[in-house]
Amino acid sequence: MKDQLEIRKTLVLSTGHVTKRVAEILDEYRSQPEGFDLYWQNIEYGWLFRRTRLDNQDLEYMGRKIPRCLRNCLDLAAANGCDYLIFDCDGPQVDQLPFYNW
């Protein structure tokens, strides 16, 4: 049987695309708080988000809970067909999103 590689697309962004307050919250929880349908984990210099649990219905519902700066980043990842979103302190700044210099 031929091995098939499973390859997933990831968007990497600067941590500066979320506000300092959102960054503090992400660091505080370190992973998904109970009752919050978005999975992430802290990595050495940022956060890794998995958007595989999010479909359009969940995004509509969750849009009321997720801070706008984070929602914009998740939307950009989804629009580009990405399964994962990594925020890295050395990640690129993109013109499509606001940048918060904290």
Where are these regions (language model features)?
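A general structural signal for short secondary-structure junctions and capping/turn motifs
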Residues: 2-4, 38-40, 75-79
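Short, extreme N-terminal segment that most often corresponds to the first beta-strand
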Residues: 1-24, 86-87, 99-102
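Short, basic, glycine/proline-bearing loop/turn elements
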Residues: 52-61
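Short, surface-exposed beta-edge/turn micro-motifs
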Residues: 8, 44-46, 82-84
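An N-terminal amphipathic alpha-helical segment
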Residues: 19-53
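Short, compact, well-ordered microdomains
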Residues: 63-102
